C-alpha cells in the first residue's frame, strides 16, 4: 500500500485516541523505565504514555514515514524509528509493549504476541487493541463495491489485507500460559458523526486504503460514489441529523 496519511488519520483524532485511553487505563500500576509504542502513528498514543510515565524512555515504531514525521514534531523528546513489528525486537529492559490499532494488519499476529510477550521481564505488560469490525456495514460494503464488474479485477485481493480476528478464546488459550494475569474484552463504540460522508472520511484513513490504492483517480471517484451511496443507506440520520458509526474493538492486557 501507499504511505499512510497522518493528516487523514488525524481528522478523527479524538475518536481514534479514545480506545488508546481505555487500553492505557487497564495497565496495572508499575514503574515503567522503558516503553515501546508499536504502530505509534502520529504520536497520539505515544503522548498518552509519556504523560503517564514521564520518567520513562519511550520509543515509537511505525512503517509510515508521514506518521513518524508527525510523531517527531509532536514529541521531540521521544525516539521514533521506522520498523516493521514482524521483524522488530524490543530493546532490552522494555517494561511495556503498547499497541493501539496496528496488529489487525499483521499476518499471524498471535505468533507475534507470543514472541513479544516472552521477551518481557516479570511484571512487564503487553497491551493491545485491535478493531474487530470487518462484519460491520462500514467494511462489508467495501467488499460489496469491490465486487462490482468495473472493480473486480483490480480489487480481487483487496479484502486480503486484513483477516477477521479469531474468537477471544483463541487468544486466551495461547496467551494465558505466558503471564500471571490476562484480561481480554470487547468494547463497542457508537461514534456520532456528522453524516455518511464523515464515515467515508474516517475509513479513508484506514480500512478503505487497500481498496483505493490500486485504483486510478477516476476509478477511485467512482468507487467512493458507489460506496458512499451504500453507506448513506446503511447509516440513516438520527434525531439530530448525525449518524452512529458502530465500532467494536478487542482489547488484551497480558502481565508477565
Curated annotation (Swiss-Prot):
Methyltransferase found in the keyword field: yes
Classification via HAMAP family: Tran_acon_Me_trans
Lineage: Bacteria, Pseudomonadati, Pseudomonadota, Alphaproteobacteria, Hyphomicrobiales
Its biological purpose: Catalyzes the S-adenosylmethionine monomethyl esterification of trans-aconitate.
Cellular component annotations (GO), alphabetically ordered: cytoplasm
Subcellular location per the Swiss-Prot or TrEMBL entry: Cytoplasm
Superkingdom of origin organism: Bacteria
Catalytic reactions of this protein: trans-aconitate + S-adenosyl-L-methionine = (E)-3-(methoxycarbonyl)pent-2-enedioate + S-adenosyl-L-homocysteine
Principal location listed in the UniProt entry: cytoplasm
Family: Belongs to the methyltransferase superfamily. Tam family.
E.C. number(s) listed in UniProt: 2.1.1.144
Biological process, per Gene Ontology: methylation
Protein name: Trans-aconitate 2-methyltransferase
Signal peptide: none
GO molecular-function term, one example from the UniProt record: trans-aconitate 2-methyltransferase activity
Sorted UniProt keywords: Cytoplasm, Methyltransferase, S-adenosyl-L-methionine, Transferase
Organism whose genome encodes this protein: Afipia carboxidovorans (strain ATCC 49405 / DSM 1227 / KCTC 32145 / OM5)
Transcription regulation among keywords: no
Any matching Pfam family: Methyltransf_25
Cross-referenced InterPro entries: Methyltransf_25, SAM-dependent_MTases_sf, Trans-aconitate_MeTrfase, Trans_acon_MeTrfase_C
